[in-house]
Structure formats: structure tokens, C-alpha cells
Amino acid sequence: MYKRQDGTILHVAVTLRDHPIPIIGVNFGGKGFLAGLEDDELDMLLEIADGQYTVSRRMMLDVELVRNERIICTQSVLNDVVIHGGHVDCIGVTAYGDGVPITRFNGDGIIVATPTGSTAYSMSAGGPLVEPENENIIMTPICAHSLAGKSFVLAPGRQITIVPERIHDRPAILVADGGDSIALIRGDQIRIRRSDNYTLLADTGIRSFYETAFGKLTDRL
């Protein structure tokens, strides 16, 4: 599968979530953390077609939007869920783990990511990099206005509930894996938990996660 952005793989991952089929991406531009091959490594596709690869199993998240005690939307993600105030608005965010408050802050929003998604928006917002085959839930604030807005790396079994607050004239926004925006209103809750499904990525063994991160994130001296 050829790709220009990781969004292509994210779309395929959700499409195949009920089917254990390994995915391989070829990066033709950009950071391309999910791509197993670069555009000058196309000859490796023949070896992959011959079964010369290992499988990297990646955790996914299931997301539920709850409104007036009813689930009105469900999605699965490989990378992340983003709740934000739109282009201009600051919102309040309260996050719960298994019903217990974890953090509350005002800011632009919050990202809830998988280890695979730790190299995406969460990283840009100052979140930690987590080895992609680990199973953790990563919460990263977006431009928090207080010291309470810190990143958390949580156990995979936690059920996370995000409650956006201070929603006034404009709705807050929910985005799952960079897809379509969903408007949030006062009183909405977003419930997030580890999915029973996994994404399988074909791993050629050409480079490790650390080599990929170093090559894509380090400036040339």
C-alpha cells in the first residue's frame, strides 16, 4: 500500500480491525512513522510478498460519545482521539480514570493516544514517545493554562472518560484518527478504552523504532 501520510494507514487499520491482515506502508513523503518502507526500498516488497517479515501487533482504542446517557457514536482508532475547542476557543477539560478524577485544566484540549500514536499529535504537544508495541494509554494536554495539565501514561486496562467543559457559543470538537470532526455540546462525555482488536503491521526488520525516531526527528548537524 503506497502512502503519502500516515492517515492512509490509519484508515486501512480501522477498515481491517476485524480481520487479522498485516499492513505494510511505503513512505513517499513526510515523517511517515507508520510506513515500514521508504520509497527507495520498493524491492523489499517482493520479499514481503514471499512472507519474509514479522508481525508487529499494535494496540487500538475504542471510543464512545455519550450524550444524555445514550451512546450516539462509536469509533476505533490506532493513533489518537483529540478533543479541542476549535480554532479560537479555550475549553475546560476533566479526565477520569475508572471514574476517579485524574486531571482538570483549561486549555486548547486534550489528546488520548496509543503508543503507536505517541509519535503523532501527542508528540507535537509535548507528550512522551512510547515504544509502539507497548500497551498503554497516553493522555497529553494541548496548550494547558495551568501546571495541572501534564501528560499521563496509564495502564491499558483503564477506562478513560473525558468531559469537556466551558463550552459556550461554539461547540467543542472530537476528532478520531484525523477523521471527520464531531461537534460536542455541554454535558457530553467521551469514553475511551483499550479495544479488543489490534492492528497488525508487517515489520521487515530493516530498522528499529529507535532508529526510525532518530532518523526522522533529529536535525542533521
Predicted regions located by residue number:
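Conserved small/polar residues in nucleotide/adenosyl-binding loops
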Residues: M1-Y2
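Short glycine-rich anion-binding loops that position phosphate/pyrophosphate groups of nucleotides
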Residues: Q5-T8, K31, T116-S118
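Gly/Ser-rich helix-loop-strand patches that form or flank binding pockets
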Residues: H11, T15-F28
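A glycine- and small-aliphatic-rich helix-loop capping segment at beta-alpha/alpha-beta transitions
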Residues: L16-I21, D39-M44, G126-E135
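Catalytic core of DAGKc-family lipid kinases
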Residues: G30-D108
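A generic structural signal for short beta-strands and their flanking turns/coil linkers
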Residues: R57-L61, V77-N79, D89-V93, D108-I110, ...
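ATP/nucleoside-binding phosphotransfer catalytic cores, i.e., glycine-rich phosphate-binding loops
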Residues: I83-H84, V88, D98-P101, K150-L221
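Gly/Ser/Thr-rich active-site loops/lids in small-molecule metabolic enzymes
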Residues: R104-A148
